[in-house]
UniProtKB/Swiss-Prot annotation:
Keywords: Ribonucleoprotein, Ribosomal protein, RNA-binding, rRNA-binding. It comes from Saccharolobus solfataricus (strain ATCC 35092 / DSM 1617 / JCM 11322 / P2). Belongs to the universal ribosomal protein uS19 family. The keyword Membrane does not apply. This is Small ribosomal subunit protein uS19.
Length: 140
């Protein structure tokens, strides 16, 4: 699981640990660094879908496929250090939203980076849509 760390990530620390320390750290030690919600989620274990995604990630790392995007519907996986540097595409209910996992994302969920709703932008009301439109000039 070798990862070439870009220069801008060299100084990054998560709870006082560098990226190299996080990558070499056993899972139970890493879990202790997480906030309570993520810690409890990981202590319960991985679901089948999460396990399958992590196996796929490990396979891509072994083969050195860092530029290939991994598509997934799994939104409830906590971002682990082994996901750093990979391109992920998480389904938001309509399409896959693509992003690259950075060290700042550790401890967050994948779904946080694939927003499921968008801001509603209402258009202009049509002719006779409201009582006030009675006084508008007829569209020609």
């Amino acid at each position: 699981m070798s990862l070439e760390i870009p220069p801008e990530w060299k100084n990054f620390k998560y709870r006082g640990k560098s990226i190299d320390e996080l990558l070499n750290m056993p899972m139970d030690e890493f879990i202790k660094l997480l906030p309570s919600r993520q810690r409890r989620s990981l202590k319960r274990g991985f679901t089948d879908a999460q396990r399958h995604l992590l196996e796929k990630v490990r396979k891509y790392r072994r083969e050195g496929k860092f530029n290939k995007t991994i598509k997934t519907h799994v939104r409830n996986l906590v971002i682990l250090p082994e996901l750093i540097g990979l391109k992920m595409a998480v389904y938001n209910g309509k399409e896959f939203v693509e992003f690259t996992v950075t060290p700042e994302m550790i401890g967050h969920y994948l779904g946080e980076y694939s927003i499921t709703t968008k801001k509603v932008e209402h258009g202009e009301p049509g002719l006779k849509a409201t009582r006030s439109s009675l006084f508008l000039a007829m569209k020609g």
